[in-house]
Amino acid sequence: MRAEARHQLKEDRFSKATLQAAEKTVHWTQEHQSKLIAAAIAVLVIAAIAIGGWYYMQQQDEKASLDLAAAVRTLETPLRPAGTPAQPGFDSFESLTERATAARKQFQAILDKYPSTRTGKMARYFVGLTSAQLGDNAAAESNLQQAAGSSDSDLASLGKFALASVYRGENKDAQAIDLYKQLIDKPTTVVSKVMAQMELASFYESRQKPDEAKKIYEQVQKENPSTESASMAQRKAAALK
């Protein structure tokens, strides 16, 4: 198979996988972000690992990909009820903080060891996410800002989307709004226009700006007739006071 054909096949497979991941994160809101980070974003990462390892065939990036897969598994490890002892032979964590701390350490090690690889850059994104989960906003901002500035449009959009959530938590409203609008203007396969619109509308609702939120919900309905997104936007608009 010629190099161009292999490249196109890789791009087609990556687009399909990342689109599926994006669809799974449509309902991601700031309130339950920590629950969906591992489940939804891991779909994207595992797909990228499989395709990236096959396409580049570079030993260093393959090793980094294996390490990243292990770190993602840590981030998805189940939590056990408080006061319940760990079961021998079954990985678990007692709290979100304990799990995020362990995962961040793994992601940081990948970033330190493979900073110039695509996998290393993805690890930086996860360092930002886990830092946000731990309330380390300075580290979250620093790492997510770098991810948001990536030349990889998919990684950049994920970085912006997560960074906007961090800004929301810090009441940096202007910065959050700007990022959502950037994503609306230039959507990607992993962060669609609808995804960014719904998050911006949710943000306006949280700031008691129902008129602004309603405008966006109406726009979503107009641009996406007869879709689940339109139905969701209609319900949310109807619930506004």
Where are these regions (language model features)?
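N-terminal positive-inside, membrane-proximal cytosolic segments immediately preceding the first
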Residues: 1-39
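Short solvent-exposed coil/turn linkers within tandem alpha-helical repeat scaffolds
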Residues: 112-120, 148-156, 184-193, 207-210, ...
